[in-house]
């Protein structure tokens, strides 16, 4: 899923 590519910086789990 390509969403994880840019979803990491807007998601709290990416912190």
UniProtKB/Swiss-Prot annotation:
One cellular component (GO) term of this entry: extracellular region
Keywords: Antibiotic, Antimicrobial, Secreted
Superkingdom of origin organism: Bacteria
GO BP annotations, alphabetical order: defense response to bacterium
Main location: secreted
Compartments where located: Secreted
Protein's job: Has antibacterial activity against Escherichia coli, Salmonella typhi, Streptococcus mutans, Staphylococcus aureus, Listeria monocytogenes, Vibrio vulnificus and Vibrio parahaemolyticus.
Protein name as catalogued: Antibacterial peptide fermentin SNR1
């Amino acid at each position: 899923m390509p969403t994880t590519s840019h979803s990491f910086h807007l998601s709290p789990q990416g912190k």
